Amino acid sequence: MNKANSFNKEELIACGHGNLFGPNSPRLPVDNMLMIDRIITINDNGGEFGKGEIVAELDINPDLWFFGCHFISDPVMPGCLGLDAMWQLVGFYLGWEGAEGKGRALGVGEVKFTGQVLPGAKKVTYKLNIKRTIHRKLVMGIADAILEVDGRQIYSATDLKVGVFSDTSTF
């Protein structure tokens, strides 16, 4: 298992193909749905709750796929993509910890949007504070997160929940 403390884009894509933590580990999406370019830091003892943290980034440029369709003459990154990135990172964290199975977003306590990501922005930063992980019959991660654009916080989410399942056929 790869217990590195940072990951580049190629390694994140490898995770999407089951080649980073193993073929049975939770996978990131690939191509357009991968909303992360790099993980700057990941650990299991830092963060606000002392149970782990992740800091990751997405480079912004006007050619990103969503600016061309959301919305015509009013391009803005869909807020749901930033929220999905937070869930992606909770699932990645569980894989990094050694969980096996398929990751699924299970919910979120509260989400607030107080700004927007526009084509002229340079960088989105995701900061997650792990609140709890469960590694029993149920495998689940819970985290609080914020999203910053060019250093300014514009989204927050509490109690992001991701589960890892050996069988999703009845989910």
Curated annotation (Swiss-Prot):
It is found in: Cytoplasm. It comes from the Bacteria. It comes from Shewanella sp. (strain ANA-3). InterPro entries: FabA (IPR010083), FabA_FabZ (IPR013114), HotDog_dom_sf (IPR029069). Pathway: Lipid metabolism; fatty acid biosynthesis. Pfam families: FabA. NCBIfam families: fabA, PRK05174.1. This is 3-hydroxydecanoyl-[acyl-carrier-protein] dehydratase. Belongs to the thioester dehydratase family. FabA subfamily. The keyword Lipid metabolism applies. Necessary for the introduction of cis unsaturation into fatty acids. Catalyzes the dehydration of (3R)-3-hydroxydecanoyl-ACP to E-(2)-decenoyl-ACP and then its isomerization to Z-(3)-decenoyl-ACP. Can catalyze the dehydratase reaction for beta-hydroxyacyl-ACPs with saturated chain lengths up to 16:0, being most active on intermediate chain length. Its EC number is 4.2.1.59, 5.3.3.14. Homodimer. Transmembrane segments: none annotated. SUPFAM superfamilies: Thioesterase/thiol ester dehydrase-isomerase. GO terms for molecular function: (3R)-hydroxyacyl-[acyl-carrier-protein] dehydratase activity; trans-2-decenoyl-acyl-carrier-protein isomerase activity. GO terms for biological process: unsaturated fatty acid biosynthetic process. Keywords: Cytoplasm, Fatty acid biosynthesis, Fatty acid metabolism, Isomerase, Lipid biosynthesis, Lipid metabolism, Lyase. Its main location: cytoplasm. It catalyses: a (3R)-hydroxyacyl-[ACP] = a (2E)-enoyl-[ACP] + H2O; (3R)-hydroxydecanoyl-[ACP] = (2E)-decenoyl-[ACP] + H2O; (2E)-decenoyl-[ACP] = (3Z)-decenoyl-[ACP]. The active site is at residue 70. PANTHER family: 3-HYDROXYACYL-[ACYL-CARRIER-PROTEIN] DEHYDRATASE, 3-HYDROXYDECANOYL-[ACYL-CARRIER-PROTEIN] DEHYDRATASE. One of its GO terms (cellular component) is cytoplasm.
